[in-house]
Amino acid sequence: MTKNEIKIRKQIIEACLLMEKKGLNQGKAGNISVRWKDGMLITPSGISYEGMKAKDIVFVDSKTKPHGIWKPSSEWRFHFDILKARKEFDAVVHNHPAYGTGTVSYTHLTLPTKA
């Protein structure tokens, strides 16, 4: 992994932890993906954000093959299809807030916009 890839993987984890802290996610629910090279980096399936390391984030290539020590989020296809169809989007955030489902924008939360 390059320094830049490690940085992006860590940013994904930080964003997941922030979602949990703000009550937008609980436990292992929800996931984040970021466009990376010819595919995407995405949170793994069934792994708690607490204690997650950069190496735990899964890369899914353009042929939908996952690379990593874990399986990608069970909703990886949802993320993959959005990123494939909408080139102007470089990240997908899927959350499960305690008091409803919705889309939340954070002006102070920075996810990478370009790999």
Give short role names for the model-derived ranges.
Residues 1-4:
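Basic/polar N-terminal segments that are highly enriched at the extreme N-terminus
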Residues 6-93:
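An anion-binding catalytic pocket shared by soluble metabolic enzymes
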Residues 40, 113-114:
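A very general structural signal that marks isolated residues within well-ordered alpha-helical segments
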Residues 47, 98-99:
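Short acidic/polar capping segments at secondary-structure boundaries
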Residues 94-98, 108:
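Histidine-centered divalent metal-coordination motifs
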Residues 102-103:
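Helix-adjacent hinge/juxtasegments
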Residues 107-113:
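Conserved small/polar residues in nucleotide/adenosyl-binding loops
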